[in-house]
Regions:
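Conserved catalytic segment of ABC-fold P-loop ATPases
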Residues: 18-26
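Acidic, divalent-metal-binding catalytic cores of TOPRIM
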Residues: 16, 29-248
Length: 248
């Protein structure tokens, strides 16, 4: 048997996908002409395995590893988002002159639900990648008044996990989350910025609700008949789903 050891440098996604995560060492630029080596074998052995709360992530990483892991480790920055609405919003926002510098960087876009975005935090922290998570506040759907909303809780695991770390509250009320977002220029922990609906988004649970509420200058808690929504949609030539009537 040969005792030879060696290494291969690559930018190939396929090479990365066909290697074990513990075999990877990532070189990332930290300053002009200066790189830092990130050892993913140590990441698994020293960050994930010793932490009882993170041990289940080993199976998760094995699953997402073959999908978008290469996009993350090669990226300058990462944007994690929930669905098609966020994707289209990001795509159009990046066309603005304001974000010209971002267009010249390698940004990885990862579609992931609010329940799972938190799973990416350890690897993003370890690789020190500046990241943005766009997710929905998702307070309980039975909250029908402003008072109900501010007393409600978020069902979003990612928001709750960030709040637990930053605010030391495992189940913060929506009012607490509103204040957290309102009192900071950016809700961020280390290198990760977290974006969700705030008090200025008209009590919306989701990005779609916030956009419609702003468009029609209304609260997301306001009600309209199906006919009124149909008329608005037709007049504005927009495409959005109007819920069917609920049988009593």
């Amino acid at each position: 048997e040969s005792a030879m050891q060696g290494f291969v440098t690559t930018h190939s996604h396929e090479v990365v996908r066909n290697s074990r995560i513990s075999q990877l060492r990532v070189l990332r630029q930290v300053k002009p002409f200066e790189c830092c080596l990130y050892d993913l074998h140590r990441f698994i052995d020293e960050v994930i395995k010793p932490n009882q709360e993170l041990k289940d992530l080993i199976e998760f990483y094995d699953g997402f590893y073959a999908i978008n892991f290469p996009d993350i480790i090669f990226a300058d920055k990462v944007i994690l988002y929930e669905g098609d609405t966020e994707r289209m919003l990001i795509k159009n926002a990046l066309l603005s002159e304001r974000f010209e510098a971002l267009r010249n960087q390698y940004i990885s876009f990862v579609q992931v639900g609010g329940a799972y975005a938190i799973n990416y935090k350890p690897i993003l922290d370890y690789l020190n990648i500046k990241s943005l998570i766009i997710t929905d506040l998702d307070f309980y759907a039975d909250a029908e008044t402003e008072s109900d909303v501010v007393q409600s809780l978020s069902t979003n695991a990612t928001i709750n996990a960030f709040a637990k770390e930053a605010l030391k509250e495992s189940e913060p009320s929506v009012q607490v989350l509103y204040s957290w977002k309102d009192n900071m220029k950016h809700v961020a922990i280390k290198n990760i910025c977290l974006a969700f609906q705030g008090i200025n988004d008209h009590y919306a649970r989701t990005l779609e609700e916030a956009m419609l509420a702003k468009r029609y200058n209304m609260s997301a808690l306001d009600t309209k008949t199906r006919e009124e929504w149909t008329s608005l949609r037709k007049n504005d030539k927009l495409k959005f789903v109007i819920p069917q009537k609920v049988d009593s």
